Curated annotation (Swiss-Prot):
Origin superkingdom: Eukaryota
Annotated family: Belongs to the distal-less homeobox family.
A Pfam match: Homeodomain
GO biological process, one term: tissue development
Location within or outside the cell: Nucleus
Keyword Nucleus: yes
Protein source organism: Danio rerio
Cysteine disulfide links: none
Gene Ontology CC: one annotated term: nucleus
Protein's recorded name: Homeobox protein Dlx4a
Length: 250
């Protein structure tokens, strides 16, 4: 047996070497087919590159000039007018409420009382200051009658330069003051004035009972201060003289 035949038999009998040769042959065949596969990817890459170029061209600074609009469209020229209607309606309602509040405030002032924003504590108007001539005429008319009819009140207000409301309020206050004096009695100038008015006996005025008939019952006997001093004067004088006599004796 020669050396060449021995080497061929060893190569044929070695399974690992034959497997290595088959693997290397398969790898070479795979490399031969792989360039085609790699070239098949180039068109896809070019397609993506073209899409990116179109996207970049759409948003490039040159494309974003004033002559050409952007990719998204937004128009500010067309607006629905109804979007501003609620605000205008609310403003009109608020103005009407202000007018209503002013009218209510005016009505409350005319009635003789002022309120703070229509709520809270009442604030009365300042009292009317009457002149001496007006007071004299009102007192004379009150001596004649305590109640005025509507024509009489209008005539008296026109003569004195007052309003009918002022005349009516003055007569109301005068009647309430007169009733209070009649109930509790009076010794002041107002009571004397009313007594003189009742004594005059005006035909239109109702009969007024005299105020001086009211008598207050006496409570207990009157106490004289002199009696107190007299009862203790003798004891005080004797007690005062006794120490003086003792000092003289010493």
């Amino acid at each position: 047996m020669t050396m060449t035949s021995l080497s061929e038999s060893l190569e044929a009998s070695d399974p690992s070497k034959s497997a290595f040769l088959e693997f290397s042959h398969g790898y070479q065949s795979h490399q031969q087919h792989s360039p085609g596969v790699s070239h098949a990817h180039y068109p896809v890459h070019g397609l993506h590159q073209g899409a990116h170029s179109q996207y970049d061209a759409a948003f490039s600074p040159g494309a974003a000039s004033y002559s050409r609009p952007l990719a998204y469209h937004y128009s500010t020229a067309h607006h629905h007018p109804g979007a501003y209607l609620p605000y205008q309606h609310n403003s009109a309602v608020g103005y009407s409420r202000v007018e209503d509040a002013d009218s209510e405030k005016q009505s409350s002032i005319e009635s003789g009382e002022i309120r703070l924003n229509g709520k809270g504590k009442k604030i009365r108007k300042p009292r009317t200051i009457y002149s001496s001539l007006q007071l004299q005429a009102l007192n004379q008319r009150f001596q004649q009658t305590q109640y005025l009819a509507l024509p009489e009140r209008a005539d008296l207000a026109a003569k004195l330069g007052l309003t009918q409301t002022q005349v009516k309020i003055w007569f109301q206050n005068k009647r309430s003051k007169y009733k209070k004096i009649m109930k509790h009695g009076s010794s002041g100038p107002e009571g004397e004035h009313l007594q003189a008015a009742s004594a005059s006996g005006a035909p239109c005025s109702p009969g007024m009972p005299p105020l001086w008939d009211v008598s207050m019952p006496s409570k207990g006997a009157p106490i004289h201060s002199g009696g107190y001093m007299n009862s203790f004067g003798h004891w005080y004088s004797g007690h005062h003289q006794d120490p003086m006599a003792r000092t003289q004796m010493m």
